[in-house]
């Protein structure tokens, strides 16, 4: 696949993993394909006796295609009464006999293959029913074959993975008879864990599970060689000696089913286990939600699109969590310092392997501190009991124990420990708050300023400068001095109603955010609201803001009040305890702590006093910090916040961001990095419709240019070179030198002493993890352990090393492998953090080891494909990075090909034993230059529902290619201050001009500070808008005629030769769909048409007026076609 697949102008074919994005083939049986000369395909099922059925006379029945042809020829010769028109009876009979004799086609059996009743053991997907080829799923009670058909793995493996089943039985008439596959040693039946070892003495194989049986030496027979252990499922198929793979001919004869149909069928089976493929065609099945848009007509349309997506995610989350009930739980009881009962328990070990349930609870259900769990006693030794508590401890590398603090310990059977059951208590609070915010945005005029309202909906609005007194010194007290790009960011943000700050890894965005909050608070416009999607991010920012000396209140959810954090002393509930101004409240609090309960009168008085104290603290605070969803807390409901800052906004969904925004935002600052991982959306349907794209991303695509922080202080300069060039256009400067990043007392032999990095070539094979939904690679795990041991021996401390991998299966396997197989003390390995790449976002370690896992022939590299995941992985380390992977599999993907070529050029692609590494001789295809776009990182926005093609039309105001002078508009619109030179001239040359109304204007001279530019910064009316939600008009107040009907409109220009075609994009009520020869559908607006009768002067006025619209190109749209290539490293 060419690298240009990442470029917006790419016309190359991009082949996707079917597991990542299933492709649906053309519907060749649709009505437009009804040709009378064609016969129906063999897989079409029709009722017996019907057309093509047994005894039927149709095209698919006995005789098949030939029957149709014979009938046609006979009709030409036989009249309506059946009498031969030429009277030559004998000749006609002879010809007819000859025609009938020619009808013995081999397809006879094939055509009736699916019209007859299939045996009960036929594959539920494709109908193949050879007993040697099929396997019975013990959970779903269905049969599946071991053939791939049109999918990336065999049908049985596809089903097991999608349905989360793990136990199978072979067919009684198959070569191995009716066999339940299970571990010879422990009886484990999870086929994803099972493998075989050939017994040396006998001609038999022994089935053993991967962990622990195949790896425990004490359990081994003298004839077993555990190094020979291989999984039963390889390349997503059962081994052919175990379950035969149907022949190619059999698979072609079978019913053809696509991966997308399989997905839909599996979803349907959850509701109706007896559903068939035919049921998928019924109306109402699998209705897709409406996709998110780039622009919205008004907030009602916005709510009508996002509301259903939030509900979809809520329903999915509820279903998932409420289905996870666990029995046979053993509880260990304890008493907390606050006199509340704490129950400790571990999830039971199952046949699926000991990490399976932990994976589901941590990854799928995202179990975290503060979640509610219901604990029930089901035994006979005490009365039946039920209690609800909040999670205060989750499983980690040290153990799988979960701890919950009970709300009330009344009746708790603390004397018994067995026969408990746990249920996850699903709470709709966060989803309710999102829905409420969407509604408020639509109906409440005071929820946000007019300017922000229109900007968020994508309307064109005159830019404004906020009237404020800029500080003489931008660095905040108690915080480090700012660099030039941070100063520019602070200075610009303070004067803008809406700002985006892009903070690449290690560029100090937390310090910048804290400084901005400090100056906003000093302006005295009431408390500043600071939010982030996660509690960890909120705590980090709260800590930094506190260092400036401001009065900060950290608002926690009530369910998290018992959880300790570095900023607990700033939490609202703890500050209330220390309020000297309310002695009565302190007295009642002390009584409650000692006795655990208060009388009803005292409790009522206590709550009233507490509410008063909370209100007083919140009103007098300079800054209030909480999560995005926490901003919907009733305690903030009556407060209005003029200034709101959302950190890590690229990790929040759009409705999540709206929860704080609707609390009166007049100045909104979004901080994040759209070149790193985006929000997590569990429901695939909602994610596909666009819920997985952040507000920050959409605003970037709309043309609001983020201010980028440009000096990184984390990585050794050698480590930052590749991410800077590939993800940030070479704009990152190093705030640390190579000498700053050499560890004292650390003696590790890097292949190149001045470059603390290498790619360790590993030839292992991937295996499906025990959960069936993840992967692991045992060879890579062994190499990771060796590298970790070498780092420890060289002088690194365990807590300075981070091991990251994209796959939960590998993370879990690594934790176990390090414990059982590490050559050093177990405690050392326990202190080494092992986590998924996604969980490590926002974190850093001195040394990072990345295990890539994927190594196969057919499956691709899964979500290693997401370049943002690679960006996060490569930018976590301060002193050194080691990548362990299979270059052959990875190099097929363009970005990884770049990385591998880069490592090879730097002579750090190595193989061989660790104590004698040598340069690898592997060769890769030469990478092409990645296309440089207007929107840095836009080519990596895999979650984007639309791309930034609007912003990269060659010859437009955006273009600065080397094929000619920039357009004259460039000099009028480019802000020279906006992009601070990154040093090397070739990098500076890649600065891309921005449309005038979206750029941060040059700072006005001191005498003009504080003056508004254009409409007041409050509720402005957008260009062409009659007011909030009003119908859009053109610049001259006239409704614009439909553009495609005008002879001189953009749609009528013949630009078919240009390589920028894009599907139709509907934006609000404006239909953007345009003819196929139009190379930029969606880029022109019907309201902004150029009428043919307009004189040149009038047209030029329109051109100037509309040149400030981010989508308008005028007659400059296609001056030339090139796009600047990205400068290499």
UniProtKB/Swiss-Prot annotation:
The modification Omega-N-methylarginine is found at residue 1019. It comes from the Eukaryota. A motif ([ST]-Q motif 1) lies at residues 1089-1090. One of its GO terms (biological process) is cellular response to lipopolysaccharide. It comes from Homo sapiens (Human). Changing residue 1084 to A: Impairs association with UPF2, SMG1 and SMG7 and impairs phosphorylation. Belongs to the DNA2/NAM7 helicase family. This is Regulator of nonsense transcripts 1. The lineage of its organism: Eukaryota, Metazoa, Chordata, Craniata, Vertebrata.
């Amino acid at each position: 696949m060419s690298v240009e697949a990442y470029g917006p102008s790419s016309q190359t074919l991009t082949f996707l993993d079917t597991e990542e994005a299933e492709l649906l083939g053309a519907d060749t049986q649709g009505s437009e394909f009804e040709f009378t000369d064609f016969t129906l395909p063999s897989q079409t099922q029709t009722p017996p006796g019907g057309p093509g059925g047994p005894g039927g006379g149709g095209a698919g029945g006995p005789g098949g295609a030939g029957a149709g042809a014979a009938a046609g020829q006979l009709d030409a010769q036989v009249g309506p009464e059946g009498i031969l028109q030429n009277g030559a009876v004998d000749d006609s009979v002879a010809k007819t006999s000859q025609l009938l004799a020619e009808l013995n086609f081999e397809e006879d059996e094939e055509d009736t293959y699916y019209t007859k009743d299939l045996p009960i053991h036929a594959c539920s997907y494709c109908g193949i029913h050879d007993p040697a080829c099929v396997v019975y799923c013990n959970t779903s009670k269905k049969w599946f074959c071991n053939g791939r058909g049109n999918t990336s793995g065999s049908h049985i493996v596809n089903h097991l993975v999608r349905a989360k089943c793990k136990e199978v039985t072979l067919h009684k008439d198959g070569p191995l008879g009716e066999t339940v596959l299970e571990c010879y040693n422990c009886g484990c039946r999870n086929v994803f864990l099972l493998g075989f070892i050939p017994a040396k003495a006998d001609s038999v194989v022994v089935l053993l599970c991967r962990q622990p049986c195949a790896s425990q030496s004490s359990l081994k027979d003298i004839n077993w060689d555990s190094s020979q252990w291989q999984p039963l499922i390889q390349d997503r198929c059962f081994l052919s000696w175990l379950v035969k793979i149907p022949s190619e001919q059999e698979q072609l004869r079978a019913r053809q089913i696509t991966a997308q149909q399989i997905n839909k069928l599996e979803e349907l089976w959850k509701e109706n286990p007896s559903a068939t493929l035919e049921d998928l065609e019924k109306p109402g099945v699998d209705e897709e939600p409406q996709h998110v848009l780039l622009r919205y007509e008004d907030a009602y349309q916005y709510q009508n699109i996002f509301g259903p997506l939030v509900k979809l995610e809520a329903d999915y989350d509820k279903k998932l969590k409420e289905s996870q009930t666990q029995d046979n739980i053993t509880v260990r009881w304890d008493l907390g310092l606050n006199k509340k009962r704490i129950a400790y328990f571990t999830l039971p070990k199952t046949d699926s392997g000991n990490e399976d349930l932990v994976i589901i609870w941590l990854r799928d259900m995202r179990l975290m501190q503060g979640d509610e769990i219901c604990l029930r006693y089901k035994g006979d030794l005490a009365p039946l009991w039920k209690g609800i508590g909040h999670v205060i401890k989750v499983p980690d590398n040290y153990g799988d124990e979960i701890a919950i603090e009970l709300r009330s310990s009344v009746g708790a059977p603390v004397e018994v420990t067995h026969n408990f059951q746990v249920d996850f208590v699903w709470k709709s609070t966060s989803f309710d708050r999102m829905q409420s915010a969407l509604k408020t945005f639509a109906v409440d005029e005071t929820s946000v300023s007019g300017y922000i309202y229109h900007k968020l909906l994508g309307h064109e609005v005159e830019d404004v400068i906020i009237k404020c007194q800029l500080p003489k010194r931008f660095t905040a007290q108690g915080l480090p001095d700012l660099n030039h790009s941070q100063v520019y960011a602070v200075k610009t943000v303070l004067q803008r109603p809406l700002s985006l700050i892009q903070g690449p890894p290690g560029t100090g965005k937390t310090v910048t955010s804290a400084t901005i909050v400090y100056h906003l608070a000093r302006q005295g416009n009431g408390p500043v609201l600071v939010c982030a999607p996660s509690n960890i991010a909120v705590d980090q920012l709260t800590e930094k803001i506190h260092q400036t000396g401001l009065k900060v209140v950290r608002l926690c959810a009530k369910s998290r009040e018992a959880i300790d954090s570095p900023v607990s002393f700033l939490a609202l509930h703890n500050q209330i305890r220390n309020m000297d101004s309310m002695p009565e409240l302190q007295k009642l609090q002390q009584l409650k702590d000692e006795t655990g309960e208060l009388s009803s009168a005292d409790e009522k008085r206590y709550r009233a006093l507490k509410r008063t104290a909370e209100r007083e603290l919140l009103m007098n605070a300079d800054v209030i910090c909480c999560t995005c969803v926490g901003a919907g807390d009733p305690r903030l409901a009556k407060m209005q916040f003029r200034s709101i800052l959302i950190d890590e906004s690229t990790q929040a969904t759009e409705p999540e961001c709206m929860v704080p925004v609707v609390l009166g935002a007049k100045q909104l600052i979004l901080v994040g990095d759209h070149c790193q991982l985006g929000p997590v959306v569990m429901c695939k349907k909602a994610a596909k419709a666009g819920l997985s794209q952040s507000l920050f991303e959409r605003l970037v695509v709309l043309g609001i240019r983020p201010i980028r922080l440009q000096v990184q202080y984390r990585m050794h300069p050698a480590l930052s070179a590749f991410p800077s060039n590939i993800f940030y256009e070479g704009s990152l400067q190093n705030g640390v030198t190579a000498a700053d990043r050499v560890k004292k007392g650390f003696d590790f032999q890097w292949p190149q002493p001045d470059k603390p990095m290498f790619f360790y070539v590993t030839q292992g094979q991937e295996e499906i993890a025990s959960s069936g939904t993840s992967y692991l690679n045992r060879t890579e795990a062994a190499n990771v352990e060796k590298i970790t041991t070498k780092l420890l021996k060289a002088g690194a401390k365990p807590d300075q090393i981070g091991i990251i991998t994209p796959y939960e299966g590998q993370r879990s396997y690594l934790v176990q492998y390090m414990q059982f197989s590490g050559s050093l003390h177990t405690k050392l390995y326990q202190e080494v953090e092992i986590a998924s790449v996604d969980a490590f976002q926002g974190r850093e370690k001195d040394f990072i080891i990345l295990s890539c896992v994927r190594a196969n022939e057919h499956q691709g590299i899964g979500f290693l494909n997401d370049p943002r995941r690679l960006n996060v992985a490569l930018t976590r380390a301060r002193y050194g990075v080691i990548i362990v992977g299979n270059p052959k599999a990875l190099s097929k993907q363009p970005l990884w090909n770049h990385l591998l070529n880069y490592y090879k050029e730097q002579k750090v692609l190595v193989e061989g034993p660790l104590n004698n590494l040598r340069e690898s001789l592997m060769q890769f295809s030469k990478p092409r230059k990645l296309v440089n776009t207007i929107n840095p990182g836009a080519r990596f926005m895999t979650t984007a529902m639309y791309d930034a093609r609007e912003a990269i039309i060659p010859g437009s105001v955006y273009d600065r290619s080397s094929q000619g002078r920039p357009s004259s508009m460039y000099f009028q619109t480019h802000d020279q201050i906006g992009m601070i030179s990154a040093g090397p001239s070739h990098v500076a040359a890649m600065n891309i001009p921005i449309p005038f109304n979206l750029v941060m204007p040059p700072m006005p001279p001191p005498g003009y500070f504080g003056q508004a530019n254009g409409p007041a910064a409050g509720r402005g009316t957008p260009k062409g808008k009659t007011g909030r939600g009003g119908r859009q008009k053109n610049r001259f107040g006239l409704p614009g005629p439909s553009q495609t009907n005008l002879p001189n409109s953009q749609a009528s220009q013949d630009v078919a030769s240009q390589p920028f075609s894009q599907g139709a994009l509907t934006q609000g009520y404006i239909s953007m769909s345009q003819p196929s020869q139009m190379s930029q559908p969606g880029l022109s607006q019907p309201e902004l048409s150029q009428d043919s009768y307009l004189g040149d002067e009038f047209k030029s006025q329109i051109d100037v007026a509309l040149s400030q619209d981010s989508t308008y190109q005028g007659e400059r749209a296609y001056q030339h076609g090139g796009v600047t290539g990205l400068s290499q490293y």
